[in-house]
Amino acid sequence: MKMDPRQLINNLKPSSTSAATATHPHCTPFTLPSNGVINLGASEYFTLTTNAIFNPECTGTADIVLTGAGTPTSFVDLRDPFYASTIPACYALAATTVIAYMLVIMLLITPRTFLVQGAVVLGRRGFTNGPSGSDAGIGIGGRPWLQKVAALTVAISLTIATADTFRVAEQQYELGLMNASALQEEVEGGMELKIIRIISDTFLWLAQAQTLIRLFPRQREKIIIKWTGFALISLDVLFSLLNNFVYNGNSRPRLFTDAVPALAYLFQLALSLLYCAWVIYYAISKKRYAFYHPKMRNIFLVAILSLVSVLVPVVFFVLDISKPTLAAWGDYVRWVGAAAASVVVWEWVERIEALERDEKKDGVLGREVFDGDEMLEVTPTSDWTKRFRKDNDDKGGTATGSTWPAMSGLANRYRSHATNDLETGSVPGQRTGRHLLAVRPPLWPTRPQPAATPINRADTASAESTAYTVRYHPISEATPPIISGDTTLSRSNSEAISISRSISNEEVDSDKPVVLEQTNQAAAVAAGLHNWQWNSLNPFKHRVQGPPAEVSLHTAKPPTPFSSHESSNKWDVRARIEGFAATQAERFREKTRPTVDTDPLPLTVIPAPSRRRAVATESEESDTDSISPTPDESSHIEVTTSRRDRPARTTDPYTPDSLNQHSITHRGSISFATAVQPELDQRVENATASPTLVGSRQTPTFSSSRSSPITVRSPVTPSLPPIIDGLPVTTIPAPPRRPRVENP
C-alpha cells in the first residue's frame, strides 16, 4: 500500500484541491495502519510492521511552545505555592495533634501546684478537686470539666483528620499528583469529622465563656457574659449544622454563594474576637501582676503563651481573606488554638489571682463586695452547668471542677453544707462521717443568745450589759474546729471563769467579771486525726476545710509526718502516683534546702527602771497607818477589786471607775483587770493581824427623784491596798463630807 505524501505531512503548504486543510489544520493524532510504507527521503523507505500513532504539529500552538521554551517562569504559575501544598498541611496537622494531646495530659494527669511564699511547689491534690484553697499555700491548677472535655474532643477530631489526610495523600501519591485543596475538601467532607467537629466547637466556646466569667468579679457581669455567650454559641451551632448537613459545607470567605455559610463564619469570627478583646482588657487591667512579678518570674512566659493562643484564631481569620490558599492547614491551627486559648488563659488568671491573694493576705480589708450582689446564696455552684451534674457537689465544701470558679473564695467556703449546724442542733447520730468532715468554721463569732425573762443584765448582749465576752485564741494554734451535734455556742455550755472575786455580797452586781468562753475541742480534733490518713491521698474525697489561706499562713502548726502508706484503696492508681510524686518532691526539697544555724544567741537582761508608784506608796502607807476607825462603826473587812469607793455607774460602762484599773479591749469588748484570789486571801490575813480596823463604806443608792434623801458616807480608811501588775498601790481616801442640813 502506497500513500500520497501530501495527504500526511504537507499541512504548511496546502494544495489547491484541499482548501479545508489549509484554512482549518487539524491537530488530532491518528493511527497509521500496519504494513504501510513510509518514505522519509529520496531513497529512504521502510514498512510499518505494527500500527503507529502520528501526532501532527499544530500551527496554532507551535509558536507559543517555542516562545515559552526559554522562560521557565511561565510554567510556575500553573502550580500552587509551597505554603498551600500538602507538605505544610501535613506538618501543621501533626504539630496541632501533638499539642492537643499535651493539653489533655496537662489537664487530666498533672498534679496540683501551690504558691508558697513565691515558690510554686508540687502538691498532693490532683486537678480533679477544683480551685480550692490549701493549708500549704494558695492553690494553682484546678480545671473545670468543660476544658477537659473540649481538649479531649479536639484531640479526637485531629486524630480522625490525621488518619483521613494520610489516606487521601496516599491516593494522590499513587496517581502522581499533589493537590492540597482537593485533600482538604475530601478530609473535611467526612461524616465522622463533621459530627465530632460540631461537638468540639460547642465545648470550646462553652469553655471560653466559662473562662470569661472568671475574669470579672461582679455578679452582674457574670450573668451578662453567661447569657450573651449562650445566645452566640447557640446561633453558631445552629448555622454550623445547617452549613454542614444542608448546604455544601463551604467555609471559605471568597467562595460564599449562600447566606447560611456566611452567617456561620460570622458567628465564629464574633466569638473569637470577643474572647480575645476581653482577655486583653483583663491583662491590661491586671498589668501589675500579669506580665512580671518578683515572686513569680515565669508568669511572663505564661502571659506570652496566653496572648498568642487568643490571637492565633483572629490572625488566621484575617488570613482567610488575604491568603485563601493558606486555609488548607490554617483550620487545624485555629482548632487547637481555641482549645489552648481556654486552658492557658485559665492558668494565667489563676497565677494572677494567686499573686493578688499572696500580696493582700496581710491586709485588714475583707472580700470585695459590689452593689447588687447577694452574697448569701449566690455562689459558683449556682450556674447553668449544675443541672447536668449527678454527683451533687453541694454536699462538699469546696468548688469542684464543674463550677464557675470565679467567686470560689468566701461565699462557697462558708455555706451551710452540713445538715446540722450550730444553730439548728440536730441529732448527732444522723450525721455521717462525710458530713462531719464538711463542717466549716463560722464566718464571724456567734453572738451569745440573750436571755428571755426575767431580764438579767449579766446575760444580755446590749451595751448596758455587766458581763462581756472575751474569746481567747492564741496565734500559735490553728483555728479550732466547730463541734457538731446538739451543742450550741452559748453561755450555758461554755466554761465561765471569773477572775474577779469579791467578799461583799452587796457589790456582786456592780462588778464586771471577765468571762472567757472556751469550747471543748478534744472530740473534733480526735475525729479529724482519725480520718486524716485515709483522706490525705484520696483526690475524690471532700476534706475538712481549714481556715482560709490568708489566715492559715500565719498560724503555727506542728509538723505532720507524711506517710507513704496512706491510701486504703489499692486500686486508686492516680492517688498513688500523685502521692509518690509529692513524696519525691518533698525529699528533693529537703536535700536541697540549706542548713540553718540553730545555735542559741546571747541573751541580755535589762532591768526595768524604778516606777514613781513605789515612792508614792511609801508616803501613803505612813499616812494610812496614822488614821484610826470610829468606835460606833461595824468592824469588818471589805475586799473589793472594782468600784471600791464609787457607786455603780450605768451611763458609761466602758470607762473604769478607778484610775488604778486597767482597761482590756478585745474587739469591742471591755473588761477590767482585778486581783486574783490568792492575793486577796493574803491581804485579808494581813489585815486581820493588824490592830487597825477599817470601817466599810456604804454604797449610796440612786433614785430618779432629786429630792430623795442621800445617805451620808462615813469616813473610811482603806487598809488593803490593791495590787496591779504585781505592785502594791494604796488609794488615798476622800475627806468625809458634811451632812446637808435642810433650812427649816
UniProtKB/Swiss-Prot annotation:
Family of this protein: Belongs to the palH/RIM21 family.
Segments passing through the bilayer: 89-109, 223-243, 260-280, 299-319
Superkingdom field: Eukaryota
Reported function: Required for the proteolytic cleavage of the transcription factor pacC in response to alkaline ambient pH. Might be a pH sensor.
Primary site of residence: membrane
GO cellular component: plasma membrane
Bilayer topology term: Multi-pass membrane protein
Keywords noted in UniProt: Cell membrane, Membrane, Transmembrane, Transmembrane helix
Subcellular location: Cell membrane
PANTHER family: PH-RESPONSE REGULATOR PROTEIN PALH/RIM21, PH-RESPONSE REGULATOR PROTEIN PALH_RIM21
Annotated protein name in UniProt: pH-response regulator protein palH/RIM21
GO process annotations (BP): cellular response to pH
Keyword Transmembrane helix: yes
Segments of this protein annotated with the region Disordered: 387-407, 441-460, 550-570, 584-664, 692-744
Segments of skewed composition (Low complexity): 696-715
Pfam family, one: PalH
Biased composition, class Basic and acidic residues, residue ranges: 387-396, 586-596, 633-649
